[in-house]
């Protein structure tokens, strides 16, 4: 029997060929390689289409590039990402929960614009100085936003949508208010969405070619590069990697059933996909982090999140070096907690307000004299030693606080904050001059050999290298700390308790600073070993993950994932001079996507029941392609949306936008099936439906454009636009009429210069100025300790009143508020 070819020629504007189904020895099978003609049907080969795409590009550019210079002050998260660009240019290390690529791109653009990092983007509403190329940085973001629209058009064409429908779908995306808003400012969302769109586009392009062809491999490589760049901008890109991986498994499954494919060719394709779609993204991810570490070489406040080994790779760090190695009785030491960022075992002359009401023992993250402890033998406290005695495993000691002259102490009292925990006891500092202490001051050193450096550090305590536990001799509990903060009375320092259970690593300590008068000057010294690239890479990811999951503080504009598909509320980005910028989606497109997802789900369920009842299913090529492509895109929607329900951190509407992009792609196919199948005998009617939908989308965009561009509006128009109560932009800020704006004088709020700018320093001798005098002066006050760490004014007041602290220096900056 001769083999009959089922593929048939189609019109250029109808790019969905028939499925190529062949009869095998036992069953029919689908030929997975597309027709050689498919690529020509779905790519721009006509002058008309090229001109249409050019017009689309111009239209999109006008929308996104319009008025980028306004607002001329910091908007929303430009506070963070503009500030990070400044840090890159200055080379000062900072901490962020996102990978570095998008931030580095902004820094590169700013550097090309001559930016010296002399503006910190400190507060929303701070006016940009003339030295900050913020328009250029926003232009970069807007350009990526415009290119994303073109990528959507090309993606729809590659997945089988006819030219005119793809064009109108892309225009709907171009006027989607939320995407316009995020692409006009210095935010991570525009680069992220561009890279995700590029990955989707490249993978859909790959599907047009035979699996082992050169064009297919080129498209796979492009997909891998885009996935790497998306993942290197925000971890959301990993969801896109997952989506591509699921589609690869889908296609490989059908390839296994394709009798025209040999096992060798299938393995070759599988290996290529692993290399291009996992290997390339991971390699790029590593490269971008390497550049990140190489660019940020100076120690700064952001580096305080990291280990001493990490910080020792940075210039101007304050990490102790050349520490005396041997620790013994009579040594004055500082004890550092291993597993939290809490810092050093600390005490100060403030008591607990409840419990024993004895002196507080805490963790303090900065170097300070109140971190110093003298090691004493438990049965000879205060005894003068004549020979050096090493601190070994099993030694029973007491820790004498050198500043307040009391000893580390535990007893049967509830801890100050974790009072509901029956496995933790209070740790205090107890004693007074002339008092030798009691048995509740006794602690037994237990060296943790597994976590200590190999060799002598496992036998006796060596500074930095030996990790050990301190067991309370009376109760058997261990000196413990965890990420629980004391209230204001404890200066928000980290709680220290004595734990009879809990995580082992939270009971581990090590000696950082160490001195002993009985050791000779030439005694062996030790320093932190600078972290390798891999160590820094791993540690930075642990910190990113930890900080990200702990972003749980309530926010006035946060929203829950369940509300996102219904656009119940937006986010205020900026508000000044009787104008607002507010993130809100285009309700016409937004709700259409949500409705279509529900309708498509019902259609699929109905079809499955019909098929189960033995009724024939539709085999029309357009319907088949519609189902396949929509399932692909809704799978992308689900992969990007579902993880939001597992996250316990703050969530905002813009977290929905990657999933929403896939929803709009699926909606594009819904519009196409209306034209190509629902109204197949009256296509003009189908096009009329699509044009009506487009017109409604454009109208919504135009009506709500004042909160995109931060332009004048009236109270009446604003109030009429608030369709839902959650659309809570402030209409009272607007004037009653547009005429009033013509007579308005715009005000500017200048910001403080960056930390590197010149300041007038005045050193104050003696006790310095009083807190009250300083607070009564005009201007913003920033208090810092001697290590440069910013302090809360109320904490400063308490320190001045109760600890005898002094104000040593006043830095005066010329600031216009």
Swiss-Prot record:
It is a multi-pass membrane protein. One of its GO terms (cellular component) is dolichyl-phosphate-mannose-protein mannosyltransferase Pmt1p-Pmt3p dimer complex. InterPro entries: GlyclTrfase_39-like, Glyco_trans_39/83, MIR_dom_sf, MIR_motif, PMT_4TMC. The keyword Magnesium does not apply. The keyword Aminoacyl-tRNA synthetase does not apply. It comes from the Eukaryota. It is an enzyme of class 2 (transferase). The modification N-acetylserine is found at residue 2. It holds the Pfam family PMT. Glycans are attached at residues 390, 513, 743. Its EC number is 2.4.1.109. One of its GO terms (biological process) is ERAD pathway. Disruption phenotype: Affects glycosylation of chitinase and increases sensitivity to calcofluor white and caffeine. Residues 2-50, 155-179, 260-273, 606-685 are cytoplasmic. Residues 71-135, 201-234, 292-584, 711-817 are lumenal. Present with 41500 molecules/cell in log phase SD medium. Belongs to the glycosyltransferase 39 family. Protein O-mannosyltransferase involved in O-glycosylation which is essential for cell wall rigidity. Forms a heterodimeric complex with PMT2 and more rarely with PMT3 to transfer mannose from Dol-P-mannose to Ser or Thr residues on proteins. The PMT1-PMT2 complex participates in oxidative protein folding, ER-associated protein degradation (ERAD), as well as ER export. Required for incorporation of proteins in the cell wall. PMT1 and PMT2 form a functional heterodimer. The complex interacts with endoplasmic reticulum proteins EMP24, ERV25, ERP1, ERP2, CDC48, HRD1, USA1, YOS9, ERO1, PDI1, UBR1, Cue4, DFM1 and TED1. Forms also a minor complex with PMT3. The large luminal loop 5 is essential for mannosyltransferase activity but not for PMT1-PMT2 complex formation. This is Dolichyl-phosphate-mannose--protein mannosyltransferase 1. It comes from Saccharomyces cerevisiae (strain ATCC 204508 / S288c) (Baker's yeast). The gene is PMT1.
